[in-house]
């Protein structure tokens, strides 16, 4: 049942000048249950002191005080204006967390002037006056308020507000919301953090201190705003400031960023020493805590507020925004405005990797005891997430998928994640803001996840799944089985796709042509890193066949003597050919100066699929004299990266270097073998005998 209250406010004309000289006004409070109420008897006076200004329509925000020692039971109060007319009001409860903690209430009073209507006005001072009524003791009075209340004095109709009343949270907070989060205005939860704003530096310092005490964490400033010229760009929202229909400008060039003491280590003399020690001891990448505090100072202009009702047409809101911007640009210097400090504070669950291995560094502080609901929420999240992360499970799975495909660059992964979230996870109207770290992780978060996935792949905890490879990279056999072999890839010119290529040994081999479409999906890094023909060690497929890998992107970058098993072959990147061998009974290694060495005497003729080329030697000569058995020294060209290409044919796959155009024409006109081929065949006959 809604109660109607009244307060009688009377002023003694004889003492009016003296009261105004002292800057206070005296009002009266009457009990409607008193039998003398409404009669000529003087009412009982309760002192309420409030400062008054002489150039404002209303008084400023200063606490007023009511005193009483006895609680009233069901009394009603009436509020009277200076003319003795009653003013009705409704007792309403504040819908924010601060009001729930303090038990404060708010009184809504109709907009009617108390003071003289001819008094001067100032837009910057036309804000509601909140009159706090706290219970005090008065031995001579029998009246008082049962619970504290906040009386809001009226303002003149049509005037804009500079300081809007304490707004309700953007979304209802759960019962397990931390106390430090309840102190933020318009608080909302974003992932593992809470965001709100403060209206003064004192309030900001109080919230930060309370947060550090409850979470028992230590923070260091990573970034602070620079003393640049004042910002003039008008904005409605940003990475740190949510949209609330009020335009603003940034009060600093950058936001304040604070990192946990277990966060990333920064540049410095000590860091160089530590990096050298870790490089000597071959330490792997160490994950660091991703928890951060963000503080952004802005200047808001509430008098240019636009409606935020979602039922209003967007075109109308857009027109209102343009009109507000136009007016604000003209009066930006005289617009005034209010300052706000938007703060985003992480919870205890946002802290990770606090295990310390460095001597002399204090161990991770014990976490602040959580409520049962917080513990239950943390347990559920740990069960649902494969990796310890504050990221959304689908985002974490996407990182694992990208790393399994070979994408290890941090910024490449971040680009793919943003596309995944904005195009696949959410509709265009439901995309979360970029500051939601659950869907838009930081670079440090991505580094930690890449490290965890790579470690799991090495240890075998995460099995490589070929089903997540793009279809353009999947090669299968005739039966449809996916092959995981690495194959020889050689760029050649002078032959059409599918055209039979005669070999130097006089046998015609049918070439299996591969269209260049699969190459478009290769990372460009592969072709820039492989400057020469590089061959992997032989790998055995399930059916016993052997395969090699060879990638060459530029013919000019190849060694000057790059040849095939017999003669010279020009290598280019016009086509990709995969050939089948007709039992070449040699295993030959080539040096840079075209020297060849045969080891056919050690390979029996019964071996079905000997490899024509095993390794390419660069800058080294074959030392036959030092090897009594005649074996050949083989050297890899640095680090070789495997390419996840699948074989279409299940038969053995070998390298078939193509010939240049001139050589093809010469061999088509001259069926006889060259002297080099004859020499090769003679060596083969001798080894067979």
UniProtKB/Swiss-Prot annotation:
Location relative to the cell: Nucleus
Keywords from the UniProt entry: Activator, DNA-binding, Nucleus, Transcription, Transcription regulation
InterPro entries noted in UniProt: CaRF (IPR029309)
Gene Ontology BP term (one): positive regulation of transcription by RNA polymerase II
GO molecular function: DNA binding; DNA-binding transcription activator activity, RNA polymerase II-specific; RNA polymerase II cis-regulatory region sequence-specific DNA binding
Gene Ontology CC: one annotated term: granular component
Compositionally biased intervals (Basic and acidic residues): 13-29
Biased composition annotated in UniProt, kind: Polar residues: 541-559, 578-601
Ranges for region Disordered: 1-46, 541-609
Major localization class: nucleus
Tissue: Highly expressed in brain and testis.
Summary of the function given for this chain in its UniProt record: Acts as a transcriptional activator that mediates the calcium- and neuron-selective induction of BDNF exon III transcription. Binds to the consensus calcium-response element CaRE1 5'-CTATTTCGAG-3' sequence.
Domain notes: The N-terminus is necessary for DNA-binding. The C-terminus is necessary for transcriptional activation.
Full protein name: Calcium-responsive transcription factor
Protein's organism: Mus musculus
């Amino acid at each position: 049942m809604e109660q109607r209250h009244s307060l009688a406010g009377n002023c003694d004309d004889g003492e009016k000048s003296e009261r105004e000289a002292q800057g206070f006004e005296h009002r009266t409070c009457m009990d409607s249950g008193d039998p003398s109420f409404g009669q000529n008897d003087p009412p009982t006076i309760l002192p309420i002191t409030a400062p008054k200004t002489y150039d404002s329509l209303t008084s400023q925000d200063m606490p007023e005080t009511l005193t009483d020692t006895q609680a009233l039971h069901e009394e009603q109060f009436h509020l009277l204006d200076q003319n003795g007319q009653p003013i009705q009001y409704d007792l309403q409860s504040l819908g924010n967390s601060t009001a729930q903690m303090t038990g404060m209430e708010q009184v809504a009073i109709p907009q009617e002037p108390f003071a003289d209507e001819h008094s001067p006005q100032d837009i910057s001072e036309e804000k509601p006056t909140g009159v706090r009524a706290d219970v005090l003791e008065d031995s001579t009075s029998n009246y008082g308020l049962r619970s504290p209340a906040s009386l809001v004095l009226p303002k003149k109709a049509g005037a804009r507000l500079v300081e809007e009343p304490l707004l309700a949270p953007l979304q209802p907070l759960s019962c397990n919301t931390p106390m430090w989060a309840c102190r933020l205005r318009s608080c909302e939860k974003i992932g593992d953090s809470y965001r709100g704003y403060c209206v003064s530096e004192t309030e900001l310092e109080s919230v930060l201190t309370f947060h550090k005490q409850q979470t028992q964490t230590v923070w260091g400033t990573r970034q602070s705003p620079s003393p640049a010229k004042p910002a003039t760009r008008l904005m409605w929202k940003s990475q740190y400031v949510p949209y609330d229909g009020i335009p603003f400008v940034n009060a600093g060039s950058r936001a304040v960023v604070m990192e946990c003491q277990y966060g990333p280590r920064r540049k410095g003399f000590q860091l160089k020493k530590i990096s050298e020690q870790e490089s000597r001891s071959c330490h792997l990448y160490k994950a660091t805590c991703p928890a951060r505090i963000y503080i952004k100072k802005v200047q808001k202009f509430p008098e240019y507020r636009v409606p935020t009702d979602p039922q209003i047409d967007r075109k109308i809101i857009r027109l209102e925004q343009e009109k507000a911007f136009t007016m604000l640009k003209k009066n930006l210097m005289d617009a005034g405005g209010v300052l706000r400090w938007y703060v985003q504070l992480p919870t205890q669950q946002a802290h990770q990797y606090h295990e310390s291995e460095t001597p002399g560094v204090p161990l991770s502080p014990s976490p602040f005891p959580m409520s049962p609901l917080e513990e239950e929420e943390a347990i559920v999240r740990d069960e649902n997430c494969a990796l310890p992360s504050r990221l959304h499970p689908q985002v974490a799975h996407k990182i694992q998928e990208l790393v399994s495909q070979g994408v290890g660059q941090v910024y490449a992964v971040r680009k793919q994640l943003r596309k995944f979230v904005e195009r696949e996870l959410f509709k265009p109207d439901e995309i979360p803001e970029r500051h939601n770290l659950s869907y838009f992780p930081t670079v440090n978060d991505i580094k930690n996840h890449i490290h965890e996935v790579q470690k799991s792949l090495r240890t075998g905890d995460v099995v490589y799944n070929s089903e997540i490879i793009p279809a353009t990279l999947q090669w299968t056999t005739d039966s449809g089985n996916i092959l995981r072999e690495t194959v020889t890839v050689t760029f050649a010119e002078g032959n059409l796709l599918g055209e039979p290529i005669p070999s130097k040994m006089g046998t015609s081999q049918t070439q299996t042509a591969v269209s260049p479409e699969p190459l478009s999906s290769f990372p460009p890094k592969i072709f820039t890193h492989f400057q020469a023909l590089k061959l992997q060690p032989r790998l055995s497929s399930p059916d016993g066949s052997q395969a090699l890998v060879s990638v060459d992107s530029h013919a000019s970058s190849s060694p000057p003597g790059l040849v095939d098993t017999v003669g010279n072959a020009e290598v280019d990147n016009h086509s990709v050919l995969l050939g089948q061998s007709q039992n070449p009974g040699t295993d030959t290694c080539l040096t840079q100066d075209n020297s060849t060495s045969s080891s056919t005497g050690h390979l029996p003729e019964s071996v079905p699929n000997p490899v024509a080329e095993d390794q390419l030697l660069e800058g080294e000569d074959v030392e036959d004299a030092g090897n009594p058995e005649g074996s050949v020294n083989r050297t890899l060209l640095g680090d070789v990266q495997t390419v996840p290409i699948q074989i279409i044919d299940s038969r053995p796959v070998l390298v078939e270097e193509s010939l240049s155009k001139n050589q093809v024409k010469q061999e088509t006109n001259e069926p006889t073998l060259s002297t080099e081929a004859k020499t090769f065949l003679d060596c083969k006959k001798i080894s067979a005998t």
